[in-house]
Design a protein with these regions (language model features):
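Hydrophobic, well-ordered secondary-structure elements that form the walls
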Residues: 71, 130-133, 143, 159, ...
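Conserved tyrosine-mediated DNA breakage-rejoining catalytic core shared by Y-recombinases
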Residues: 10, 37, 41-84, 150-157
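Short, polar N-cap/turn motifs at the start of nucleic acid-interacting alpha helices
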Residues: 46-53, 117-119, 138-158, 181-187
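Residues in the recognition helix of alpha-helical DNA-binding motifs
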Residues: 42, 110, 146
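Active-site/catalytic core of tyrosine-dependent DNA strand-transfer enzymes
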Residues: 1-8, 51, 70-119, 124, ...
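Short alpha-helical segment immediately N-terminal to, or the first helix within
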Residues: 28-29, 132-136, 146
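Basic, Lys/Arg- and aromatic-enriched nucleic-acid-binding interface segment
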Residues: 1-42, 50, 61-65, 85-86, ...
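Catalytic-site neighborhood detector that most strongly recognizes the C-terminal catalytic loop/helix
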Residues: 56-64, 76, 99, 147-182
Length: 188
C-alpha cells in the first residue's frame, strides 16, 4: 500500500458501515502486520494483556512454528473495544453464523468496498510495515521475525532462536504511532 492508500484506508475506515468487528480486525492486521488468516481465527486465550503479547500456536501459522508478537498500546485499545462485542466467545472475530471464526474473504471484501485500488487486500499491510521499518533503520532480523518469516539460511535457522521481543515491541509501538499519526492527520 502506498502512503496515499494508507491515508485513504483510515478515511474509509472512519466511514465504514459494516460490522464493527470487521473494522477492528482490519485495524489489528494493520497494527501487527499479521496475515489476515491469523487475525481471522485469533482466539481470546492467545492474548496476554498483562505482558502485552499475542501467542499464536504453530498449528495456526503458515511456517508451522509458534509465534509470539508484542502488542502496542493501540492494539490493546483495539482488543478492549472488541471485548465489548465478542469477548464472551472463543474467537475475536466469530463467523456470523455463530460457528467458527470469520473468513479472510470477508476482510478482503470490506477493503474492496473501500476502493483503495486494484489488488489492495488486508495482506497488503505487510509490505508498508516492512518497507517503513527497513527505511527507518530497524533491525532486519526483528522485522522478519515479526512477519513470521522463516530464515532461508538453514544453518542460521538451526542456531538462531532469538525472539527479539524488546526490539519488536519498540518497532511495533513506533509503527502503531506512525499509523495513529496518519489516521489523525490524514497523512502518512
Amino acid at each position: 500500500m502506498t502512503r496515499e492508500q494508507i491515508q485513504r484506508f483510515y478515511q474509509e475506515l472512519r466511514g465504514y458501515r459494516g460490522y464493527p468487528e470487521t473494522s477492528l480486525c482490519l485495524r489489528l492486521i494493520a497494527l501487527t502486520a499479521c496475515r489476515p488468516g491469523e487475525a481471522a481465527d485469533a482466539e481470546w486465550d492467545e492474548f496476554d494483556f498483562e505482558d502485552a503479547l499475542w501467542r499464536r500456536p504453530a498449528a495456526k501459522m503458515k511456517a508451522r512454528r509458534d509465534h509470539v508478537s508484542p502488542l502496542s498500546a493501540q492494539v490493546i485499545a483495539v482488543l478492549k473495544d472488541l471485548q465489548h462485542i465478542t469477548g464472551d466467545g472463543r474467537y475475536l472475530f466469530p463467523h456470523r453464523s455463530g460457528k467458527g471464526f470469520t473468513t479472510p474473504n470477508r476482510l478482503t471484501y470490506a477493503m474492496r468496498d473501500m476502493n483503495l485500488g486494484r489488488g489492495t487486500t488486508p495482506h497488503c499491510w505487510r509490505t508498508p510495515f516492512s518497507t517503513w521499518a527497513n527505511e527507518n533503520g530497524y533491525r532486519p532480523d526483528a522485522i522478519e521475525r515479526q512477519l513470521a518469516h522463516v530464515e532461508s539460511n538453514k544453518v542460521r535457522a538451526t542456531y538462531n532462536k532469538a525472539l527479539l521481543l524488546d526490539q519488536r515491541r519498540t518497532l511495533l509501538q513506533d509503527w502503531a504511532d506512525y499509523l495513529s499519526a496518519a489516521e489523525g492527520s490524514g497523512t502518512a
